[in-house]
């Protein structure tokens, strides 16, 4: 450890600063290492260059605690009585800990996760939090991940992961399925500043994420601070978009009591321009079609939420015990049906959600080596759909009228998407995830994991006949998953293995009113599902810089809530006959690096995969005359492909991350039940992008204008190759496909010397290209955003 000191002016004598750099022995910066000053309860994390800074510290002597992932941490005494200091701390590139020379040896958390053998990508949101980016945009730059959105901010979002999408890819927040949080608290609404990192597991999920998933999962790890802190940000941009985030917390360094509060607000008109084959007006007198360039006129979106945690950490009887509360709500206008030909002018939905949670975590509980963590949540969600006006609208925002000047209706006494409705769904979700681990030996660990989820939905609509309302029963869905895991390591941790076995059980029960002649009768549906699955993940460090990763799983996913029970606000019809999806998943990949040549640093990651799927659950086709859609099983699908990612760093100034993904998912069932060959046998999956690439370039200027200030300029390029909207064999030439899309984004960020204030500007889709997704739904064109971030305490 070295100390580089400099003096302050007399005016600043009572306040000092502590700066430093944490690097690995090979020269690579140590990112996200914790640096904590105990006496004043302040902490920070190192940036991507390994640098940290504390400003305006009262003169005195301090104890600085430095902790890297999966180490006990080290303590350094610093004297700031007379002058400021600069620390240089060097970390080795392995997991052992050496305190004698104030040198710790560790790996980043991301690398530790990857070296367990799973195919996983880690997206660090913290270093991009000062930019005006959505969390979905950051995740979408990950190799093998394609974000599917049906519009602008707040629109329906799902994820395509190595060719599998929708609910085949499970999404978690801190290991709990995201559906328990309500749709108003999702990756689309949570700002990056509230997220520490996003873990993307491709194909094979570890046992501790006890869920049924066919194509992998995305685990959003929310930021957790152990100090007193306060930060706020505000951004404004195109389409009248406002976004606010405030994050504050207090920690008592004596009792270890802490409280954290985070809040967010998103608001936008989403009035961007759309044009093309699906944007037109019809002359009521001649019936002629005129294609127009129009603004979306009924697509406002607003969401807000508050998240509070209160509890203790690092006390005798608990490593962590926390009570949490999340309250959020969302309002959004609905501009279109499932396709852009269907234009709405009055339909809207509202959602509110409240979630109470309890978390407990303790190592060496009862006996040494036994660890327990448990998380329980109770959530209540209200979902309301308002659709009572039957008028047809054109893309010019005007009511369509007939020859007599009277409004044209979708249907008499109906709404825009069918029967008039004020439907209200009241949903209750109870969930518990518990993990019990026992370290049998330094090389062997066993685990037992349990997940319980009880979902109920009560449906009511005051506009429906009373007899029908009386017969509409509560929907029940109960899911239980038990998994067992065994982890081991051999040859001084060069070989690591992870074996697991999972048991799935799901029960569904409901009663629906149906017409039987002139009467309305109740039809009861009940179905129980029981299955099992198993898998393994293995990693082997061939050399310190070459690691082989392989994983395989017999995976299963049971039909989800919206797929089975429908969702009125998203135009989804129930499909009670869906079968579970099953798949045999296999991954083979390599981690190469870090390779260092003078000031140049390289990392390469690659993964090859196979997915052999039966009964894939996918969205059915929605025609222009249909306002709703359901889900269906596809007999057999086989997907193969690969991901490749390259990271380059020059002198901790120039950073380049480039990735390429290609998969080949084909319909693999040749004959139907009558022996006839499917016309789309061996076709690519419809509405599925299969070739994507992304490149992010950033250059940083340190000490820009003033000492300790930072300026960064960044550019992002995104490429999506054309893909068919429907089956290739059914598509007409020149139509029914989503064209090749290229996106160019620019950004610039400036951080003041005290590290408290940052200002960023982002320009997205600067060439104003048409961008389509989700069955040819057009996304925003060129847009500009400005964001101010202020951190008075950090």
Go through the PLM ranges and name each one.
Residues 25, 34-36, 67-71, 81-129:
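Short, acidic, small-residue-rich periplasmic hinge/interaction motif at the N-terminus
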Residues 55, 176-203:
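Short acidic/polar hinge/loop motifs at secondary-structure boundaries
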Residues 89, 192-231:
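A beta-strand signature from Gram-negative outer-membrane beta-barrel systems
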Residues 136-177:
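Extracytoplasmic beta-strand/coil segments of soluble accessory domains associated
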Residues 309-329, 351-518, 523-525, 529-545, ...:
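Face-selective signature of the C-terminal outer-membrane beta-barrel domain
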Residues 504, 603, 607-612, 630-726:
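Gram-negative outer-membrane beta-barrel transporters
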Residues 549-553, 580-640, 661, 667:
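Membrane-embedded beta-barrel scaffold of Gram-negative outer-membrane proteins
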Residues 556, 614-615, 713-743, 748-794:
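C-terminal beta-signal and adjacent terminal beta-strands/loops
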């Amino acid at each position: 450890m070295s100390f580089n000191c400099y003096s302050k002016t007399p005016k600043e004598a009572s306040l000092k600063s502590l700066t430093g750099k944490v690097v690995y022995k090979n020269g690579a910066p140590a990112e996200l290492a914790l640096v904590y000053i105990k006496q004043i309860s302040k902490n920070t994390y190192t940036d991507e260059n390994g640098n940290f800074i504390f400003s305006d510290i009262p003169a005195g002597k301090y104890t600085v605690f430095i902790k890297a992932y999966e180490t006990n941490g080290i303590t350094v005494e610093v004297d700031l009585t007379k002058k400021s200091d600069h620390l240089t701390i060097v970390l080795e590139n392995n997991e052992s800990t050496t305190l004698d020379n104030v040198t710790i040896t560790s790996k980043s958390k991301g690398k530790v996760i990857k070296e367990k053998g799973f195919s996983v990508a880690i997206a660090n949101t913290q270093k991009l939090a000062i930019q005006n980016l959505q969390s979905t945009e950051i995740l979408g730059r990950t190799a093998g991940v394609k974000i599917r959105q049906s519009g602008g901010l707040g629109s329906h979002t799902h994820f395509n992961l190595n060719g599998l999408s929708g609910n085949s890819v499970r999404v978690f927040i801190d290991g709990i399925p995201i559906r328990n949080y309500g749709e108003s608290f999702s990756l689309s609404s949570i700002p990056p500043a509230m997220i520490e990192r996003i873990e993307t597991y491709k194909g094979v999920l570890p046992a501790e994420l006890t869920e049924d998933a066919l194509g992998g999962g995305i685990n959003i790890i929310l930021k957790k601070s152990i100090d007193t802190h306060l930060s706020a940000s505000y951004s404004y941009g195109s389409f009248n978009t406002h976004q606010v985030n405030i994050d504050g917390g207090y920690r008592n360094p004596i009792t270890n009591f802490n409280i954290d509060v985070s809040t967010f607000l998103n608001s936008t008109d989403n009035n961007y321009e759309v044009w093309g084959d699906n944007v037109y007006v019809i002359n009521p007198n001649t019936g002629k079609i005129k294609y127009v360039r129009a603004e979306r006129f009924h697509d406002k979106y607003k969401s807000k939420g508050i998240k509070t945690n209160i509890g203790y950490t690092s006390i005798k009887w608990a490593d962590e015990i926390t009570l949490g509360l999340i309250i959020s709500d969302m309002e959004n206008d609905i501009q279109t049906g499932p396709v852009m030909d269907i234009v709405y002018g009055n339909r809207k939905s509202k959602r509110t959600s409240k979630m109470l949670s309890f978390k407990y975590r303790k190592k060496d509980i009862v006996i040494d080596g036994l660890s327990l963590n448990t998380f329980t949540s109770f959530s209540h969600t209200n979902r309301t759909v308002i659709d009572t006006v039957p008028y047809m609208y054109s893309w010019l925002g005007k009511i369509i009228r007939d020859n007599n000047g009277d409004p044209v209706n979708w249907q008499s006494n109906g709404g825009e998407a069918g029967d008039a409705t004020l439907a209200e769904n009241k949903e209750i979700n109870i969930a518990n995830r518990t993990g019990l681990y026992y370290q049998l030996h330094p090389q062997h660990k066993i685990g037992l994991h349990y997940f319980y989820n009880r979902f109920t939905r009560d449906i009511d609509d005051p506009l429906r006949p009373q007899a029908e309302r009386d017969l509409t029963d509560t929907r029940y869905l109960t899911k239980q998953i038990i998994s067992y895991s065994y982890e081991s390591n051999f040859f001084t941790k060069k070989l690591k293995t992870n074996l697991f076995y999972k048991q799935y059980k799901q029960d569904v029960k409901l009663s629906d009113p149906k017409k039987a002649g002139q009467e309305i009768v109740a039809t009861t549906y009940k179905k129980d599902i029981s299955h099992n699955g198993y898998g393994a993940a293995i990693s082997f460090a061939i050399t310190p810089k070459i690691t082989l990763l392989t994983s395989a799983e017999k995976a299963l996913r049971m039909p989800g809530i919206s797929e089975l029970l429908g969702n009125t606000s998203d135009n989804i019809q129930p499909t009670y006959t869906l079968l579970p999806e099953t798949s045999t998943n296999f991954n083979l990949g390599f981690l190469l690096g870090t390779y260092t040549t003078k000031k140049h640093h390289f990392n390469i990651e690659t993964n090859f995969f196979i997915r052999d799927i039966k009964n894939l659950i996918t969205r059915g086709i929605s025609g222009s005359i249909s306002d709703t859609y359901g889900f269906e099983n596809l007999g057999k699908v086989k997907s193969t492909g690969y991901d490749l990612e390259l990271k380059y760093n020059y002198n901790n100034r120039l950073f380049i991350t480039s990735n390429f993904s290609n998969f080949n998912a084909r319909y693999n069932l040749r004959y139907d039940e009558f022996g006839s060959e499917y016309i789309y046998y061996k076709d690519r999956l419809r509405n599925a992008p299969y070739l994507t690439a992304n490149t992010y370039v950033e250059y940083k200027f340190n000490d820009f204008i003033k000492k300790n200030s930072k300026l960064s300029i960044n550019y992002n390029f995104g490429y999506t190759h054309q893909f068919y909207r429907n089956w290739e064999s059914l598509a007409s030439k020149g139509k029914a496909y989503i064209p090749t899309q290229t996106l160019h984004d620019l950004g610039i960020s400036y951080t003041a010397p005290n590290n408290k204030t940052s200002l960023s500007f982002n320009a997205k889709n600067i060439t104003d290209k048409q961008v389509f997704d989700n069955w040819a739904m057009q996304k925003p064109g060129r847009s500009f955003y400005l964001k101010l971030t202020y951190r008075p305490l950090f």
